[in-house]
Swiss-Prot record:
Lineage of the species this protein comes from: Eukaryota, Metazoa, Chordata, Craniata, Vertebrata
Family indicated by similarity: Belongs to the PRA1 family.
Organism annotation: Gallus gallus
Modified residues (N-acetylmethionine): 1
Principal place of residence: endoplasmic reticulum
The keyword Ribosomal protein is annotated on this UniProt entry: no
Originating gene: ARL6IP5
Protein name in the entry: PRA1 family protein 3
BP-aspect Gene Ontology terms: cellular response to oxidative stress; glutathione metabolic process; intrinsic apoptotic signaling pathway in response to oxidative stress; L-glutamate import across plasma membrane; L-glutamate transmembrane transport; learning or memory; negative regulation of L-glutamate import across plasma membrane; negative regulation of mitochondrial membrane potential
């Protein structure tokens, strides 16, 4: 299936008034995780633009350190994904505790970058965009259009870059399994 880039959402949709933002339910982690995953899928191009702006600013101020930092994070991420696919215990951990898995990747990257050089580049150039994405995805309430687009991604009608990343983190399999078990019930 061909990878499609999600459209850039309008500013009014991406950052509307305060009525479209809400505090996540910290007691229901699966619901919060679902909101984050769905917002990451729906607003992925907007998040990419925000991250690109932050990376460009930090990269302009310190290009070599930004290149080293980005390379380290990508290599650590790919290494952890590869190991988790080959080691069953890590695969289960990644599936049960996705936030912990991402934190381990970020901490490993942090220590490698601190060993290699400039930690501030890591903090502002790599961690800040991820933090901004997570905060927005956690607080932004979903709308009907968001839900419809996410269903296309879940059932495989559409494949996007964020969908590929979330698949690598095994965050979409549960949704597909739920949908697959729901379809026969609807037919009855």
């Amino acid at each position: 299936m061909e990878v499609q880039v999600a459209p850039l959402r309008s500013w009014e949709d991406f950052f509307p008034g305060s009525d479209r933002f809400g505090r996540p339910d910290f007691k229901d982690i699966s619901k919060w995780n679902n909101r984050v995953v769905n917002n990451l899928l729906y607003y992925q191009t907007n998040y990419l633009m925000v991250a690109a702006a932050v990376v460009a600013i930090v990269g302009f101020l310190s290009p070599l350190n930004m290149l080293i930092g980005g390379t380290v994070v990508i290599l650590v991420f790919l290494g952890f994904v590869w190991v988790s696919h080959n080691k069953d215990i890590l695969r289960r951990m990644k599936k049960q505790y996705p936030t912990t898995f991402v934190i381990v990747i970020m901490l490993s990257s942090y220590f490698l970058i601190s060993y290699l050089g400039d930690v501030m580049v890591f903090m502002f150039g790599i961690t800040l965009p991820l933090l901004l994405m997570f905060i927005h995805a956690s607080l932004r309430l979903r709308n009907i259009k968001n839900k419809l687009e996410n269903k296309k991604e879940e059932i495989g009608l559409k494949k996007t870059p964020m969908g590929i990343i979330l698949d690598a983190l095994e965050q979409q399999e549960d949704n597909i399994n739920k949908l697959a078990s729901y379809i026969p019930k609807v037919k009855e």
